[in-house]
Amino acid sequence: MRNQYGKPSFKNKEHIKFNISHCNGLIACAVGLEEMGVDVENIRSFDDYVVRRVCNMKEINDIYSSHDSKRTFFTYWTMKESLGKALGVGLHYPLRENEFIKNGDGYLCNYEGLKIKNYEIDNKFSLSICTDKNQEIILKEVNLNGR
């Protein structure tokens, strides 16, 4: 089943929440009992137009003053997308109005009760998971290539 924004859910198992994302051979899947969102992106070049369209001034300044602007942009991008997925609206929310505040090993945002953790994978991917702030996040790697 999917909601009006395309977020999937299990039919007859609504208490089990999940979210998926994939990029260049990497698949991220989050499963739990609370709403969550996950996004993974390959760290690569980005379009300045996209930055100005989806980022607020603080984020734009962070991106362009960073020693690694690609990594900084995709950290913000995956956090924004994981947040939208956790809210169940995808990218249909005011992307520039949110503020991500570093808090310990994660980030808080304007939506009370949610936290976001960002991970770098193999120096090539940015992965963000948005969950209820009390939900524990456990990462497990599964290699489907048998290696």
Predicted regions and their residues:
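Core catalytic alpha/beta fold that binds nucleotide/phospho-ligands
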Residues: 1-147
